[in-house]
Design a protein with these regions (language model features):
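Short, well-ordered, mixed-charge alpha-helical segments that flank or form enzyme active sites
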Residues: 38-43, 88-92, 210-212
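Condensing-enzyme catalytic core mediating Claisen C-C bond formation in acyl metabolism
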Residues: 48-112, 117-120, 154-162, 167-170, ...
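Claisen-condensing/thiolase-fold acyl-transfer catalytic domains that form or cleave C-C bonds
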Residues: 2-26, 36, 74, 100-101, ...
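Long, hydrophobic, well-ordered secondary-structure blocks that form the structural core
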Residues: 34-42, 48-49
Length: 232
């Protein structure tokens, strides 16, 4: 067992590490997994549940969920073909209630570097999925990538934006947490791959590298994002 933590980018991080271990011959089967829990995240990073604090429109709700993928050396299954390890990006966002804005620059940087390194374009993927930028971060990411010359409007989704039904559940800017990209990828997207509805996914799980202490001290929130290409 190797414990990993990259905030909410952990699903992509664990998939990339598992892929590298397999490629290096250090295992035959490796499980990449992560999880999150709403109540645990609320108590640690926000407010006690009993406090009943009001939420602003940019707030996100931590997903209670877990996802796992088994990676092996052979079989008629989707393959991890590329891994792009992200860089920490800090654009000075200090609002812990707007983590989509804090993480978006890291997602944009990783996606841009992935395309630059591989020579690929958004059209090479059926779906480009960021982890938990939510409604706010997704909009920022779309605009920033357009400034780099990449139009992703037709095939870009965000796991945090789509995991809840905001009209019915009133979830503000959407979902977040390590389990957010994990359940959407291991459940929804993987089923689409296995049914051959899609052939390629670029998963870019995103994380806000903050602590309870740093937020209370008014420090900025660095972001991180790792990209993993999963293809048939």
């Amino acid at each position: 067992f190797i414990g990993l933590y990259g905030a909410c980018s952990t699903m992509s991080e664990s998939l990339s590490m598992a892929s590298l271990f397999l490629d290096g011959g250090f295992g035959s089967y490796i499980v990449a997994s992560t999880s999150s829990h709403f109540s645990a995240a609320e108590r640690q990073f926000r407010f006690p549940l009993e406090y009943g604090c009001q939420r602003c429109p940019t707030c996100q709700w931590t997903v209670t969920g877990s996802g796992a993928m088994v990676l092996g050396r052979s079989g008629d299954y989707p393959r991890v073909t590329y891994v792009t390890t992200g860089l920490v990006k800090d654009y000075g966002i200090k609002d812990a209630n707007n983590m989509g804005a804090a993480m978006a620059p890291a997602a944009v940087d990783t996606i841009y570097n992935h395309f630059k390194d591989t020579g690929r374009t958004p059209k090479d993927y059926d779906i480009i999925a960021t982890g938990d930028l939510g409604k706010v971060g997704k909009e920022i990411t779309t605009k920033l990538l357009a400034e780099y010359g990449y139009d992703v409007k037709d095939n870009y989704i965000d796991c945090g934006d789509m995991i809840f039904d905001d009209e019915r559940q009133k979830t503000d800017a959407g979902g977040s947490g390590c389990g957010c990209s994990a359940v959407v990828t291991c459940g929804y997207l993987y089923k689409k791959l296995m049914r051959r509805e899609i052939k390629s996914v670029l998963l870019v799980s995103t994380g806000a590298l903050m602590s309870t202490t740093s937020s209370l001290q008014g420090e900025s929130i660095p972001g991180i994002a790792h990209a993993v290409a999963i293809e048939f």
